[in-house]
Amino acid sequence: VATSGGFSGEQTSTDAVALALAATDGASGYAEQTAWAVRDVDPGAVAREAVEIARRTANAGELAPGSYRAVLGPYALGELLQYFAFDTFSGLALLEERSYLSGKLGERRFDEKVSIADDALDPRGLPKRFDFEGVPKQRVPLVEDGVLRGAVWDLPSAARAGGSRQSTGNAPPPAERRWGPLPFAISVAGGEAESVDELVELVDDGIYVTRLHYLGIVEPRQGILTGMTRDGTFRIRNGKLAEPLVNLRFTVAVPDVLADVPGLTRETTLANEAAFYDERYAYGALVPAIATARFDVTGIGGPPGI
C-alpha cells in the first residue's frame, strides 16, 4: 500500500480453509476449519464432522413458528454477528444514524457475559498489520460486559466525526469504500462452558442451529436480520439433541439474541466460509457457541440439503 499521506508498506499473509458439505436426499451436514497455517487445518476431521451431521439430519420434521431458546454453533453465530457488525459497528453508519449504536453508546444492552472486539492482531485469527489506507491495526473494544463501547473508523469517517476521533485501521479495499469502515476481525470472548453439549444441557425445550444461509438485513437501527438455518438444525428436548428439523426461516433482532445468554463455550472457533457471493476473502470471526433465551422462528423451508 502506498498513500498520498506518505505511507508505503507491504504485508504478506496466508490462510488455509477446508470446507465440507455432505448431502443425500433430504439430509445435509456442514463443517469448516480456517487457519493462517495449513498445518493447522485437518480436512479429514472436517469431512467426518460434516458426514456425521448429515447422517443425523435424515427424516427431518417441522417446527411451529415461535420464539425458542436456542444454541447457536460457532458457524451460525459467526455469520449472524458479521452481518450485524457491518452495519452496527461502522463509524460511518453511526455518523449517519443508521446504526443500532445510535444514541446507545455507554448503555448495557447485551448480557454481561457478552464482550465483542474487532481484533485483527489476534494470532488465532487471520492477522493483518495495517488497513488499505496504511493505518496500523489495533484491538477495538465494541462491547464490554454487555455495554456498547464503540465503533471502527477509517480516515474519511474519522475526519467527518471531527474532534479527537482517529482511524482505528478499518479502511476497506478501494472497491468497497462506499461501505465505510468495516470490522473485519470480530472476536467474541469465550465463556465458561467446556463443550457445546454443556450449553445444550441448559435448554429444556429449544433448537440447535449449526449454520445459517441467505441472511438479509431488515432494519439496521434495531439490528433485525432474517435468514434460514441449514445443514444441521435439531430440536433440543430435556437438555439433549433430539430429532432433526427442516430448514427454518428466522427473523431476529440480534440485540434480543444477545440480551439473555445463559452460557458460551470457553473454546472459540475461527468461522469463515472463505467466499461471499463467489468473491474470495480472507477474514473471519473468532466466536464461541452460544446459548440464547430467544431465537424467533417465523416459518419453515425445505428439508436439509435443499
Residue ranges and their predicted role:
Residues 1-306:
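N-terminal small-residue-enriched
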